[in-house]
């Protein structure tokens, strides 16, 4: 009597990474099931023009891949959860003068929480995705580790993993470079082998988040003043949701020198403008923390910290505060630390944890 194969549900976006992840896991001997999370419904005209990563065309791409791999495929309805846990907080964060990262919230609440629970509810052992990251076990603790392809590493968006979630998650693409993943897809005859990577926010097909928020909550977007750090009025802005810390383009100001957004004040509806040197800071406060390598930060430790997806990690010290948050002190000034973005802590290639930036000091 043979051993029963372990079952894995692969979250499939219709892209090359999750498609090859499904193939690799089947080759490794798992019983693979493909599933696409239906999270947003574009109107037909936009759908046909844009074809984003959660669109109907993406669902069809995923279905065709599963047919090719001879594995079952399902579409799971996550629309209500996505709206409540990703879209509505995304809109509110911008209205509150912060710059959110919806991918992190989607990973935290949907992919590695609700999807995992749904999978376990039907007797599936693991979930898997096409993320570029690795999971390993050291002693009695699961670790999240940077991908072998440094350019494509996605651990910044994955720091909210719990130990139980890591124990039931597989990420086979983390062992490969992106180029090799595309080669594998071509070798096995997948039509998505040359499909371009999705770079926009998946539920905003034209990548214009300001217009999206204006349409969703028109009364919440109001014109206000651009001011300098002394409070002098420099001009009019079209609504704080259109701006982020460090922004230079699209301000519509003519003051005779390059100027940048240095702060956003939702209480006064003002956007503060200054010189580039004003957006370089060394300290921040972060909350909504999650740690992977240990349960709780008991004392200050030295780390490498990353303040946005595209940033290089900088050496820093994280200090626990009495209110449960942490202070992060960088050795060198960081450009455009932004409230609402996450700060993620590393020890070499190992993800220590992270949190959401709440204040810049």
Swiss-Prot record:
Site positions (Interaction with tRNA): 131, 341
Transmembrane domains' residue ranges: none
One GO term describing the cellular component: cytoplasm
Residues annotated as catalytic: 106 (nucleophile), 202 (cysteine persulfide intermediate)
UniProt keyword annotations, A-Z: ATP-binding, Cytoplasm, Disulfide bond, Nucleotide-binding, RNA-binding, Transferase, tRNA processing, tRNA-binding
Catalysed reactions, semicolon-separated: S-sulfanyl-L-cysteinyl-[protein] + uridine(34) in tRNA + AH2 + ATP = 2-thiouridine(34) in tRNA + L-cysteinyl-[protein] + A + AMP + diphosphate + H(+)
EC number, UniProt record: 2.8.1.13
Protein's cellular compartments: Cytoplasm
Spans annotated as Interaction with tRNA: 152-154, 308-309
GO biological process, any: tRNA wobble position uridine thiolation
Disulfide linkage: 106-202
GO molecular function: ATP binding; tRNA binding; tRNA-uridine 2-sulfurtransferase activity
Domain of life from the UniProt record: Bacteria
Pfam families per record: tRNA_Me_trans, tRNA_Me_trans_C, tRNA_Me_trans_M
Residue positions binding ATP: 11-18, 37, 130
Keyword Ribonucleoprotein set for record: no
Stated family: Belongs to the MnmA/TRMU family.
PANTHER family named in the record: MITOCHONDRIAL TRNA-SPECIFIC 2-THIOURIDYLASE 1, TRNA 5-METHYLAMINOMETHYL-2-THIOURIDYLATE -METHYLTRANSFERASE
Function text: Catalyzes the 2-thiolation of uridine at the wobble position (U34) of tRNA, leading to the formation of s(2)U34.
Protein name as it appears in the record: tRNA-specific 2-thiouridylase MnmA
Species per Swiss-Prot/TrEMBL record: Clostridium botulinum (strain Eklund 17B / Type B)
């Amino acid at each position: 009597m043979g051993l029963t194969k372990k079952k894995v549900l692969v979250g499939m976006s219709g892209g090359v990474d999750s498609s090859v992840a499904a193939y690799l896991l089947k080759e490794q001997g798992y019983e693979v099931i493909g599933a696409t999370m239906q999270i947003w419904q574009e109107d037909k005209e936009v759908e046909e023009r844009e074809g984003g990563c959660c669109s109907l065309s993406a669902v069809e791409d995923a279905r065709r891949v599963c047919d090719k791999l001879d594995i079952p495929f399902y579409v799971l309805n996550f629309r209500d959860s996505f709206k409540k846990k990703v879209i509505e907080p995304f809109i509110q964060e911008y209205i509150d003068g912060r710059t959110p990262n919806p991918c992190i919230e989607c990973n935290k609440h949907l992919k590695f929480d609700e999807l995992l629970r749904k999978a376990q509810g039907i007797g599936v052992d693991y979930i898997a995705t096409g993320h570029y990251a690795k999971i390993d076990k050291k002693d009695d603790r699961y670790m999240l580790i940077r991908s072998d392809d440094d350019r494509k590493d996605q651990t910044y968006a994955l720091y909210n993993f719990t130990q139980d979630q890591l124990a039931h998650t597989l990420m086979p693409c983390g062992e490969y470079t992106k180029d090799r993943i595309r080669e594998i897809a071509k070798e096995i005859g997948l039509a998505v082998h040359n499909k371009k990577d999705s770079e926009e926010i998946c539920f905003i097909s034209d990548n214009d988040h300001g217009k999206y928020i204006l349409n969703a909550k028109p009364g919440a977007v109001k014109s206000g003043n651009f001011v300098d750090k002394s409070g002098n009025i420099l001009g009019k802005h079209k609504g704080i949701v259109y701006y982020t810390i460090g922004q230079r383009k699209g301000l519509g100001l003519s003051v005779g020198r390059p100027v940048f957004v240095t702060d956003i004040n939702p209480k006064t509806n003002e956007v503060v403008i200054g010189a580039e040197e004003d957006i370089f800071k060394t300290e921040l406060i972060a909350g909504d923390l999650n740690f992977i390598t240990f349960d709780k930060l008991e004392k200050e430790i030295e780390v490498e910290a990353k303040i946005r997806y595209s940033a290089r990690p900088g050496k820093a010290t994280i200090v626990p505060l009495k209110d449960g948050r942490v202070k992060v002190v960088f050795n060198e000034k960081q450009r455009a630390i932004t409230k609402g973005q996450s700060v993620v802590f590393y020890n070499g290639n190992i993800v220590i944890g992270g949190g959401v930036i709440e204040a810049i000091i």
